[in-house]
Amino acid sequence: MREVLLLGSLVVLALLSLFPCCSCLSQGAEEEEDDGEVRLMGLAGEAAGSPGSGGGFSANGKFSYGYASSPGKRSSMEDFYDTRIDGVDGETVGLFGVFDGHGGARAAEFVKQNLFTNLIKHPKLFSDTKSAIAETYTSTDSELLKAETSHNRDAGSTASTAILVGDRLLVANVGDSRAVICRGGDAIAVSRDHKPDQSDERQRIEDAGGFVMWAGTWRVGGVLAVSRAFGDKLLKQYVVADPEIKEEVVDSSLEFLILASDGLWDVVTNEEAVAMVKPILDSEQAAKKLLQEASQRGSADNITCLVVRFLEQENHLPERPTNDQAS
């Protein structure tokens, strides 16, 4: 047993030398030099280092969306988000995502720029949406790993995404960003945080030849606090980008969806988040409320919140400023 622990410690030390700024390891991550901009489906976005919010409506009037994002107490911004409302083969498709990077912003920005672009091109987007999503996660991860060959610092990202196709809502997730819906007034988690101490995740990692050990929290190889992610090429054998996908029917009982990075969920429960959003019809204001509450409760991480409100059961749409629209 002593030999196993010693070997594990040596492996951890070796990995730490390759993960100098992994935010899943330390809150005091070194600031990434090339954070870039957070952009929203081609709109003028907010600079990655400053708080921003915005939103809009679908052309068919069936849903509204709003987002709010801030670096919080961190000096660097590794959260990204994306919202798109695209017409594909005559169908309106809504795509929403929150991407929380670690080891810098590089991986999260790549996923934000490529995941939905790849998905709307998938030939099975309508005929087999779940397969299309799963295959797109995998192929986008492969593209990221190829792009990462020129970097000597490892980087990765979570992804919590929601796809609206007709009366179907499909939520896919890797990592510890989270999706929660309000249905019939109840808070329901529609994603699972991927942590290495979960029995099935730990078994999968160990079956692949890896190990999970305690280093402040349970970590893959003693380094990474999430068990699934995009990127993380040095741990890719164990840290997969295979999403868990859940489908919900969009009907009159489905009120809204919240997607958020762990900067929210570390300090706000699912039930609290739903209770905060429920009385606020304006999706942007709802997202801002969540962000403000997380900040007031002392969240130590970047905070990104995205709210999608389903409007078929509403009698009217709340007014929104015209400057949220594309210029």
From Swiss-Prot:
Residues 64-310 form the PPM-type phosphatase domain. PROSITE patterns: PPM_1, PPM_2. It comes from the Eukaryota. Keywords: Hydrolase, Magnesium, Manganese, Metal-binding, Protein phosphatase, Signal. Mn(2+) 2 binds at D100, D262, D301. It catalyses: O-phospho-L-seryl-[protein] + H2O = L-seryl-[protein] + phosphate; O-phospho-L-threonyl-[protein] + H2O = L-threonyl-[protein] + phosphate. Mn(2+) 1 binds at D100, G101. Its cofactor is Mg(2+); Mn(2+). Binds 2 magnesium or manganese ions per subunit. Residues 1-24 form the signal peptide. Its EC number is 3.1.3.16. One of its GO terms (molecular function) is metal ion binding. One of its GO terms (biological process) is regulation of intracellular signal transduction. Coiled coil: none annotated. Pfam families: PP2C. SMART domains: PP2C_SIG, PP2Cc. PANTHER family: PROTEIN PHOSPHATASE. Belongs to the PP2C family. This is Probable protein phosphatase 2C 59.
